[in-house]
UniProtKB/Swiss-Prot annotation:
Disulfide bonds: none
Domain of life, per lineage: Bacteria
Record protein name field: Recombination protein RecR
Family: Belongs to the RecR family.
Xref: Gene3D superfamilies: 3.30.60.80, 3.40.1360.10, 6.10.250.240, RecR Domain 1
UniProt cross-references to InterPro entries, sorted A to Z: DNA_Rcmb_RecR, Hlx-hairpin-Hlx_DNA-bd_motif, Rcmb_RecR, Rcmb_RecR_Znf, TOPRIM_dom, TOPRIM_RecR
Biological source species: Staphylococcus haemolyticus (strain JCSC1435)
Physiological role: May play a role in DNA repair. It seems to be involved in an RecBC-independent recombinational process of DNA repair. It may act with RecF and RecO.
SUPFAM superfamilies listed in its UniProt record: Recombination protein RecR
Domain Toprim span(s) in chain numbering: 80-175
Length: 198
């Protein structure tokens, strides 16, 4: 189908988002045409602002407006425990349960040889540097319970064991193949309480 160039560009832009295929992108593009101009401008500004005003915490890798982030700055946090997660949505899911009081480290992905993603492509080197500099006693590996998450957890566990830090994994109860961000607070709470040493 031939569209006017601005619509084609908008459809292509929407298709860059995860889970958005050609039909959904087309629907979103045409919906944008029906929106009030002020709403479109506000939407476009929100997209630009999120890129300009947010950064990643230099300590843990979590999204933040200020560096370091509010979690790393919180002196009430237990600095002897770091929970390693795959992405920012996992930090948000863990924080919702309001039980975990330690720090975080966001990897921004998981090891996936099939996708050409190795350990050096995610935030593992900064984790190892951090463990050498801080008084960490326990590392909780909270990767998603899928093949990539398990591979990443095993890799980190092997790297960290020689340093002498206790390495634990969230307890089962999280469904295999599922994502941490979709788990409810009760499931996450039980998983953190029943974590096991690796």
């Amino acid at each position: 189908m031939h569209y006017p160039e601005p619509i084609s560009k908008l459809i292509d832009s929407f298709m860059k988002l995860p889970g958005i295929g050609p039909k959904t992108a087309q629907r979103l593009a045409f919906h944008t045409l029906d929106m009030k101009e002020d709403d479109v401008v506000q939407f476009a500004k929100a997209l630009v602002d999120v890129k300009r005003e947010l950064t990643y915490c230099s300590v843990c890798g979590h999204i933040t407006e200020n560096d370091p982030c509010y979690i790393c700055e919180d002196k009430q946090r237990d600095r002897s425990v770091i929970c390693v997660v795959e992405d920012d949505k996992d930090v948000i899911a863990m924080e919702k349960m309001r039980e975990y009081k330690g720090l975080y480290h966001v990897l921004h992905g998981s090891i996936s040889p099939m996708d050409g993603i190795g350990p050096e492509d995610i935030n593992i080197p900064t984790l190892i540097d951090r463990l050498k500099d801080e008084e960490v006693k326990e590392l909780i590996l909270a990767m998603n319970p899928n093949l990539e998450g398990e591979s990443t957890a095993m890799y980190i566990s092997r790297l960290v064991k020689p340093i002498g830090i206790k390495v634990t994994r969230l307890a089962q109860g999280l469904s295999v193949g599922g994502d941490l961000e979709y788990a409810d607070e009760v499931t996450l709470s039980k998983a953190i309480a029943g974590r096991t040493e690796m």
